[in-house]
Amino acid sequence: MLAGCGGGGHGTATKTQNRCPTTGAHVTFPLLDPKTPHDVDVLTNLGEFAFRLDVQDSPCTTSSFASLVRKHFFDGTIFHRIVPGFVIQGGDPTATGRGGPGYTVIDVPPKNALYTEGVVAMAKSSTEQRGSAGSQFFIVTAPDAGLPPDYAVLGVVTKGLKVVERIGRLGNKVTERPTRRVAVLRMTLTS
């Protein structure tokens, strides 16, 4: 299944458009070159953090996410779910936990995938297939979230983990809603 998602090429993206399994709207986006590091810089109203995309293990998910970043899809969104000591979740343009880009891609994570502090992965509903990814993502703030390997791994925080931890303290553990608005002012991709 993932063999069709690969591609050669040079630079930040291959010239080949995606052949990734998708559901929903028909979309195409360039595939990222797995030999080049790709970082997402996230500027929030509480500070900045960055994460490196795991193109090797999640070629379709990372390429789709990078395409959304380039389109400024995430700019102005909020972290709509904050569970102290567990995760922060964002990427929903409706801020309801039900929004997305109108399509999903699939990158089934390895059976040994771990969701430890700083790991960035894609959120999905319990009815969606393993590895389904739209636009909603979460960042683990616990030493180990204890989740099964069902969530496509997007990458890992490489800078600003203290900012992520600070955001992670601004949630209500019962309602899982933020106690303070945390907005993504801008996301940018560097390669």
PLM segments and residue spans:
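Cyclophilin-like peptidyl-prolyl cis-trans isomerases
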Residues: 2-191
